[in-house]
UniProtKB/Swiss-Prot annotation:
Ranges of compositional bias, category Basic residues: 1-11, 211-221
Protein name: Protein Jumonji
Gene name of the encoded protein: JARID2
Chain positions with N6-acetyllysine modification: K378
Motif interval(s): Nuclear localization signal: 104-110
Domain ARID, residue spans: 621-713
Subcellular location: Nucleus
Organism: Homo sapiens
GO cellular component: chromatin; ESC/E(Z) complex; histone methyltransferase complex; mitochondrion; nucleoplasm; nucleus
Length: 1246
């Protein structure tokens, strides 16, 4: 036994034990192996009797000088292979430990097996100590050398039992899989380099035995040399795996060609190491055994390159220095000793094997798939990153060793370690997820500084080539690979790129959420934009980079940088710069450096998303949509309904592209037989991180495409004709698909829409449109008088029932999503980013790809966005009294109460005075639109990626209407109405038509201020969270009043009542005697009073004499108040009292159908009475009587006239009861004007 390894006290057992194999069988196996080794030694002695002395002399000379005279190429081969095999120990079958002594003069140990399985771990030190090798001479030929110095492990005996009686059984125990020390690797590498010449007697000493032709070269004369025995023993598992997975015939032919090419290469390059030349000669002499030659040479070259040991560096080194290096150097090879990994029954090729394949393939004249043509799809996908890095490492290591060693230490040369790192990275990202969802600007910068040391490994993992520095070699090698291996290239090149894409998907949204978009993206773009307001176009050109020439016509919006003193009150500051920036439609405000509010969001807050089909945001119809319509039509004929596309990893599957790709690859059967599902999933850009992506992909094919795929080409053409005919009929009846809205009949919209309206997505109705709203009203209402009052409603329902064809919802591009948490949304955003981009893109790249998708419509892209009411889930701004910036004027939760905003009189109105969060991902879009009330608003980007804004000033409205009407071919439909139906038109197209379009890129921590009437569009560049709220100054009231009348005419529901706002302003400002405000609203109050009183008189003249008052809280009610109970409908919120015809929000008065609780505004009620010729069941409900309205308006006009010295514009009707009326008017409290609820009602008939 060895001195360092004491003999164990072995207890003799006659029964089986659970650990290892029975002792009795182990002794028998040892005897069998001993006899096998002895027989092999004897046969070698007989065959090489003449070469024993010469071989020993060569070994002695090798230790003393740089010449190799008698060892022969066979020994040199074994030493070269030993250099390679030092890097190649299997993670599953081999042992990465060294249990033996290097010195041959030490006592040879008795052959003994360990009892337990060795358990070496990837990228970890071996479990046994490393022995220090003494530079002693080899033993004489007469010394007993039948036994190997190796201490075989249990795996070796199990391997022997499995291979017994087959040609795969090694001739010698030295071929089994004990590992070795890195010190020996260094020694063997140096010895190989020091060999200058080779003798020709190797041809006679390399006879092969009929039992195993591959292994004869490693033992020459019965002595087990350190180099040859260890290298061959290390090499054998590689050969065994190759025998399982590769075709031997192809290997032999390709290896023979590789050998001859290497011989030519060594002859053409005399500057290489002399050992290369001698190896070539040895190969030429023993060319009848090509597989092992190929393995030895290639592994020697590749592994030495990976470890950074160059032969040129050691040519001039002496033996003494080589020995010293061998004894002192650490053992880096333990991080890369992996030969094969068995996963799910398939043998996965790993580091050294793929290095061998990569180095061998460029030397073939013909394409060869002998090495990895049997790799399964799952195996390829799990190791695609490692293969990609190996391809890059091959070129990188030629020029620099330390750089590769740095990669080696980071643990990326083994698939198992690569998988572990991927899992670790996912764990780290999961830990960072909460922080990434809600980081403020302050946290973003801290996180960016903390992540700087970690970002290079992440980038190297996703794209090893560019990160490793010597990328000059890698492209050349890839070119060789593409030139020589034609069949393998498409798949390999695809799988080189896909891991890169998946990695970017995992890192990009995280980086964006951690503020890298705030800092790193600024480095990629010009910094002139935020620095100067006077040079917006320069920064725009810098940001857009190589954009199209047509985009040059767009100007950048002004960028404002207020000082700390100016950055106090937003409305005062905006008013001060309004004259300069309002003509652009919007401006961007960069706060002072000390403005850093912390963004606090609940990671688990849930909200309902909206699904946007980006490819349908322009023209609804395209090649992808047409194919999907054919699939849906066929499924419908089979009785299969596909309401939603299948989801994989939160991303919608592109069925049309799926069908095309699977047919291009030969159909499902061929994809399954060739195990191409992984490749197909990559081509569909399904994230690799998606759970069970292959299973879900196969399930989707069987469920939705199998039947359609089985149709004949004639049936496919017939389906296409039917779909196109149906589309033509639909467009003839309703016009272009872009003009179809999700609720074409606004006048029958029974309930208000409470979702926020910021002029971006513009109040998208649920995906079921009017029908779902109709169901919410209740079946009881449809069974009674409403059918008499609204006979046309039945017609609408009938039309929709008739339109249950395939194309009935193809005009939609925005759908209602599902309820998700913020964490889930973030992960979905990360997956979609990885689908669309292979690395973190710049805003210019995202902009270019976005408009390509919108215009070409060749693939299905679905993204999500969400709007969250901060009143429910909390704001991103600090709100606690003790928190910094919680009372700052630019805090958007404080802005609605700003004294300069007239909207403060409305109270809390969702989507108007209550801020809301906009949560988006890459390509999330706010289509061209303006706020329906033409209200200005402020948007603040809390965290995440940049947002690209486009703006058209309000002055371009008329020109824009004409252009849009022409572009969209709106047959009678107003152009702006179609534009606001979620239609995206490229700013380039609008610029060419003469429309002024301005652009800017909002970054995290910046404000965007949109002015009244501007048309705005926004595209997100990744996961982002922003917050928006409206404001309004006195100057807006005139525009708002006209807008309210237009919305009433178009039957569009308003989020608040303009009458209520005007009366609340009059009530509040009259007490303060705010002259400028009162003078602005006085004319509007006059017009409102005249219209209200005129319509009441017309209804009275038409026969409506029944009336009642609601919303009063004083004691001025009549005696009849206590006789009637308040009706249920009077308890409804004011926002729910909408006219069923025009959606007008009734505040001053309404007409009610008492039996059915149906509400009309006065104008619509007058039309109804004229049409029905009866007022039966109708009652007028009013908030203020005629005298109160007149008194309020007179009061305002009186205060204005006091300032102006004139009362001619004020209409007054003095009556004997003016005093009481005046008191009643004064007693009306503001709480009554809010009319949130009514406690009593009075009804009387006259």
């Amino acid at each position: 036994m060895s001195k360092e390894r004491p003999k164990r006290n072995i207890i003799q057992k006659k029964y089986d034990d659970s650990d290892g194999i029975p002792w009795s069988e182990e002794r028998v196996v040892r005897k069998v192996l001993y006899l096998s080794l002895k027989e092999f030694k004897n046969s070698q002695k007989r065959q090489h009797a003449e070469g024993i002395a010469g071989s020993l002399k060569t070994v002695n000379g090798l230790l003393g000088n740089d010449q190799s005279k008698g060892l022969g190429p066979a020994s040199e081969q074994s030493e070269n292979e030993k250099d390679d095999a030092s890097q190649v120990s299997s993670t599953s079958n081999d042992v990465s430990s060294s249990d033996f002594e290097e010195g041959p003069s030490r006592k040879r140990p008795r052959l003994q097996a360990q009892r337990k399985f060795a358990q070496s771990q990837p990228n970890s030190p071996s479990t046994t100590p490393v022995k220090i090798v003494e530079p002693l001479l080899p033993p004489p030929a007469t010394q007993i050398s039948d036994l190997s110095k190796r201490k075989p492990k249990t795996e070796d005996f199990l391997t022997f039992l499995c291979l017994r009686g087959s040609p795969a059984l090694p001739n010698s125990m030295v071929y089994f899989g004990s590992s070795q020390d890195e010190e020996e690797v260094e020694e063997e590498d140096d010895e190989t380099e020091d060999v200058k010449t080779a003798t020709n007697n190797a041809s006679s000493s390399c006879q092969s035995t009929p039992r195993k032709g591959k292994t004869h070269k490693h033992v020459h004369n019965g002595h087990v040399f350190n180099g040859s025995s260890r290298s061959t023993r290390e090499k054998e598992p590689v050969q065994k795996h190759k025998s399982k997975e590769a075709t031997p015939a192809k290997e032999k032919h390709s290896d023979h060609r590789a050998d001859s090419r290497r011989e030519q290469a060594s002859a053409n390059h005399p500057a290489a190491a002399p050992s290369t030349g001698s190896s070539a000669k040895g190969l030429a002499a023993t060319h009848h055994h090509p597989p092992l030659h190929r393995s030895a040479q290639d592994l020697r070259k590749q592994v030495s390159k990976v470890n950074g040991v160059t032969r040129m560096s050691s040519l001039g080194a002496g033996v003494t220095s080589a020995k010293k290096m061998r004894e002192v150097r650490p053992s880096p090879s333990k991080t890369v000793k992996y030969t094969a990994t068995v996963t799910k029954g398939a043998v996965t090729y790993t580091k050294a094997k793929r290095e061998l394949v990569k180095d061998t393939k460029p030397n073939h004249h013909k394409p060869s798939s002998a090495v990895n043509h049997t790799i399964s799809g799952k195996t390829e996908s799990s190791n695609a990153k490692t293969r990609k890095q190996v391809l890059s490492l091959g070129g990188a290591s030629k020029s620099t060793g330390p750089a590769v060693n740095g990669l080696k230490v980071s643990g990326r040369l083994n698939p198992k370690s690569c998988t572990k790192e991927v899992g670790g990275r996912q764990l780290r990202e999961g830990l960072q997820l909460r922080e990434g969802l809600r980081n403020s600007k302050r946290r973003l910068e801290e996180a960016h500084q903390a992540e700087k040391p970690q970002s290079p490994p992440k980038k190297m993992k996703g794209a090893a080539g560019p990160a490793e520095g010597p990328g000059k070699k890698a492209p050349a090698e890839r070119g060789l690979l593409n030139g020589h291996v034609k069949k393998e290239v498409p798949e390999r090149s695809l799988e080189r790129n896909r891991p890169k894409r998946a990695t970017a998907g995992k890192s990009t949204p995280g980086r964006q959420a951690h503020g890298k978009a705030d800092s790193a993206s600024c480095e990629n773009r010009s910094t002139s934009q935020p620095e100067s307001v006077h040079k917006p176009q320069d920064s725009g050109k810098a940001e857009k980079g190589g954009g199209k020439a047509g985009w040059a016509a767009m100007d950048e919006i002004p960028v404002l940088r207020p000082s700390a003193k100016e950055f106090h009150d937003p409305l005062i500051y905006i008013e001060s710069v309004r004259a300069q920036v309002e003509k652009f439609g919007m401006c961007r405000v960069i706060p002072p450096p000390d403005w850093r509010p912390e963004c606090k969001l609940n990671d688990e807050m849930r909200f309902v998303t909206q699904i946007q089909h980006i490819h349908k945001l322009g023209r609804r119809w395209g090649p992808n949509v047409q194919r999907l319509a054919c699939i849906k039509k066929h499924l419908k004929s089979q009785g299969i309904t596909m309401d939603e596309l299948p989801l994989i990893g939160g991303c919608e599957l592109d069925l049309a592209c799926f069908f095309r790709l699977i047919n291009e690859m030969g159909g499902m059967q061929q994809v399954t037989d060739l195990k191409k599902w992984n490749k197909l999933a990559d081509m569909l850009r399904i994230p690799r991180t998606a759970q069970d992506r292959l299973a879900k992909l196969q399930e989707a094919y069987c469920q939705y495409l199998l039947s359609y795929d089985s149709l004949s080409p004639e049936e496919h053409r017939r389906l296409e004709k039917e779909v196109l005919m149906e589309k033509e009929i639909l467009e003839k009846r309703k016009g272009p698909l872009e003009g179809h809205t999700e609720n074409d009949h606004h006048k029958f919209h029974p309930l208000p829409r409470f979702e926020p309206k910021n002029g971006l997505i513009h109040g998208v109705a649920p995906r079921n449109g009017f029908r779902s709203k109709l169901k919410e009203v209740g079946q009881a209402q449809l069974k009674t008088g409403r059918r008499r009052l609204f006979a046309q409603e039945k017609e609408v329902v009938k039309e929709e029932e008739e339109d249950k064809g395939v194309l009935n919802d193809f005009h939609k591009c925005i759908y209602k999503g599902r309820s998700v948490s913020l964490t889930t949304f973030y992960r979905t955003a990360r997956n979609i980013m990885s689908m669309c981009f292979s690395k973190e893109p710049a805003p210019a790249e995202i902009e270019q790809e976005y408009w390509r998708l919108v215009e070409e419509k060749d693939c299905h892209v679905a993204v999500h966005c969400g709007k969250v009411d901060t009143n429910t889930h909390g704001s991103g701004f600090p709100v606690g009294k003790s928190e910094p910036f919680s009372r700052h004027g630019w805090n958007l939760t404080v802005l609605p109460n700003n004294t300069g905003s007239i909207l403060r009189h409305l109270g809390a109105v969702p989507g108007v005075t209550i801020p809301w969060l906009n949560i988006g991902m890459v390509f999330s879009t706010s289509c061209w639109s303006r706020d329906q009330n033409h209200l200005p608003y402020i948007d603040y980007l809390h965290t995440g990626a940049d947002c690209i804004w486009y703006c058209i000033p309000a002055e371009e409205e008329n020109k824009l209407e004409d252009v849009v009407h022409t572009l969209l071919q709106a047959n009678g439909t107003p152009g702006l109405q179609m534009l606001e139906s979620n239609v995206m038109i490229s700013p380039e197209v609008l610029c060419k038509e003469g429309i002024k379009v301005h652009r800017t890129v909002q970054q995290s921590g910046q404000f965007v201020v949109c002015f009244p009437g501007s048309f705005v569009s926004k595209v997100c560049c990744g996961y982002s969270v922003s917050e928006t709220v409206h404001f309004a100054t006195t100057q807006w009231t005139s525009m708002g009043f006209e807008t309210a009348k237009e919305m009433k005419r178009r039957h569009i529901a308003k989020p608040f009542s303009m009458e209520k706002l005007l009366y609340q302003i009059a009530q509040a400002e009259a007490k303060k005697e705010n002259g400028p405000t009162l003078s602005t609203i006085s004319a509007l109050l006059d017009e409102l009073r005249d219209t209200e009183l005129r319509q009441r008189r017309q209804l009275f003249e038409a026969g409506l004499h029944s009336s009642a008052r609601y919303g009063s809280h004083d004691g001025s009610s009549t005696v009849a108040d206590g006789k009637k109970k308040p009706r249920k409908w009077l308890q409804l919120e004011t926002s729910e009292r909408r006219c069923q015809i025009c959606q007008h929000l009734c505040y001053l008065s309404m007409v009610v159908q008492e039996n059915e609780n149906v509400v009309f505004c006065l104008e619509c009620a007058l039309r109804h009475v004229e049409k029905q010729k009866s007022c039966r069941g109708l009652k007028l409900m009013y908030r203020y009587d005629e005298e109160q309205i007149i008194s309020l308006v007179n009061q305002i006009c009186g205060k204005v006239s006091g300032k102006n010295g004139s009362i001619e514009n004020c209409l007054s009707k003095p009556t004997p009861k003016r005093g009481p009326r005046k008191r009643a008017t004064v007693d009306v409290p503001p709480s009554r004007l809010s009319a949130s609820s009514s406690s009593k009602s009075a009804s009387s008939s006259s």
